[in-house]
Structure formats: C-alpha cells, structure tokens
C-alpha cells in the first residue's frame, strides 16, 4: 500500500522537472515510430508486473532501471517511458533518469489497458521421439 501523499509528492517532484505525461495515443505514436527507439518500462515491483502489464513493456523495477540503464536501454539517444499503477515508482524513476540526461516520459495506463503477460509453457522433456524427426533429417550424436 502506498503511504498517504506519496503519489502526490512523487508527481509534484516529476512535474517540477518538467517530465511530460503521455496519454495512450501519444504512447502508441512513440512506440510506432520506426525512426526512433522508445523503451517502455513497467517500474513496479516484479510481483505486480507479472500479474498484468502493458503490451511490449519490459519489467524493470525503478531502482534497478536507474542503476542498470545501460543494460535495460542500450540504444543511445533513445526515449524512455515509465509507468506504474500507483503513481509513485514511475515518477521517482523518471526523475532520476531525467537527471541522468535521458529523454523520459511518464504514462498512467488505464486499468483496462493492462493485460496478463503471455504464459510460457516449459517442457522439460529432454529427448525427441525418433518418429517426430523428419525422414530426411541428419542426426549427429555429440554425446
């Protein structure tokens, strides 16, 4: 739970640095631009982003994103858009990224825009039945 006033303080801090907030249309336009890289980061705790997030978003908790920007956003002069759902993590993260010289924006998604991430099925079967291999396949046993 967010402490009373935390979201307002975080928003005021970001606003004081003139960090713009994008609506859904502006975000779509940025992400659709083939001439400029735009990163979209979910600044929430991973336990939140694993339940529902925005399509194309990368989970990057705010502190980790700030500390490992070269890992998360390796393209020079790229734009960064950060979002959360409680209005605390994203503004604070955006503020730090702004101070580091990044072109950064905030986004507050509508709850209906958040979707469950795709479920990845893991198959730990180690072998493939011979019948499943194409007749013309060449099998090389390196073990």
Segments the model singles out, each with a brief description of its role:
Residues 1-39, 43-143:
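Rhodanese-like catalytic fold shared by cysteine-dependent sulfurtransferases
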């Amino acid at each position: 739970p967010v402490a009373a006033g935390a979201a307002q303080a975080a928003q005021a801090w970001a606003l004081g640095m003139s960090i713009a907030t994008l609506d859904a249309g502006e975000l779509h336009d940025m992400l659709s631009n083939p001439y400029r890289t735009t990163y979209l980061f979910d600044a929430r705790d991973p336990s939140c982003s694993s339940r529902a997030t925005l399509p194309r978003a990368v989970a990057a908790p705010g502190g980790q994103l700030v500390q490992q920007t070269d890992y998360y956003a390796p393209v020079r002069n790229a734009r960064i858009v950060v979002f959360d759902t409680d209005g605390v993590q994203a503004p604070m993260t955006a503020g730090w990224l702004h101070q580091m010289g990044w072109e950064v924006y905030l986004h507050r998604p509508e709850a209906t825009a958040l979707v469950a991430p795709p479920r990845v099925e893991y198959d730990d079967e180690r072998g493939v039945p011979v019948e499943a291999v194409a007749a013309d396949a060449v099998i090389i046993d390196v073990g």
